[in-house]
Amino acid sequence: MVTKKPVKKKVVPKQKVAPAPLAKPKKVEVKKVVNPLFEKRVKNYGIGQNVQPKRDLSRFVKWPKYIRIQRHRAILQKRLKIPPPINQFTQTLDKPTAQQVMKMLEKYRPENPIARVQRLKAKAEAKAAGKEEPPSKRANQLRQGINSVVKMVEQKKAQLVIIAHDVDPIELVVYLPALCRKMGVPYCIIKGKARLGTLVYRKTCTCVALTQVENADKPNLAKLVETIKTNFNDRFDDIRRHWGGGLLGPKSMARLAKLEKAKKREMLQKN
């Protein structure tokens, strides 16, 4: 018999597949060398044990008293039922209209303290020199302060009344919207007693009133008055019906939800 020679198979070398162009290369984990002499101990964060980890401790900060008071007031105004005469001060003039009003009031700011001193000094010097000046007409300026504004409203001389929303105590101005409506004077509630204070060179101001304006500003004032009347004077009946507050906190809401869930479970068990 003739023996066949075994055929040698060709060994084809394995080709490496090219990696994907956007594939991230695998990170090679480097094993940390641990010294066996050091024992691993679990940290105990109890009192007098390990140093505490860094946490956000702002909840436990003892804040200044004025900050605590304003936070308590904000929460109380949400929780308690607020009657409509006080709640109306939460509904302020919209931002674009408020900016237009402030722009108008800027033109009729009263004279600053330095200018007043200089004017009175010049007047006194003229009087000492024997020069008598005729009495000058009062300039078209803002009327400031609650007494002056109320007087202007009662005499129906005020063309526009602007009230701050955050007067404290609120009793100073709580009756003013009703008085303005009764006398037919347009009024609006604007954000910030400090904002009104800047107009009259004071820290804060409860309210200001416009009595007279220049002829050039009369068309702009008429447009503003029309918008303000629509938002405040004409909506007075609607405003005086709306109570404020009465909102529960997250803890109370969670407690009520838990009770409702328990009631539903009991009803299902009975059925």
Curated annotation (Swiss-Prot):
Signal peptide per UniProt: none
One annotated GO biological process: maturation of LSU-rRNA
GO cellular component, one term: cytosolic large ribosomal subunit
PROSITE patterns in the cross-refs: RIBOSOMAL_L7AE
Coiled-coil stretches noted in the UniProt entry, renumbered to this chain: none
Listed GO MF terms: RNA binding
InterPro entries registered for this protein in UniProt: eL8/uL1-like, Ribosomal_eL30-like_sf, Ribosomal_eL8-like_CS, Ribosomal_eL8/eL30/eS12/Gad45, Ribosomal_eL8/Nhp2, Ribosomal_eL8_euk
Keywords, ordered alphabetically: Ribonucleoprotein, Ribosomal protein
Pfam family, one: Ribosomal_L7Ae
Gene3D superfamilies: 3.30.1330.30
Family: Belongs to the eukaryotic ribosomal protein eL8 family.
PANTHER family given in the database record: RIBOSOMAL PROTEIN L7AE FAMILY MEMBER
Protein name: Large ribosomal subunit protein eL8
Native source species: Anopheles gambiae
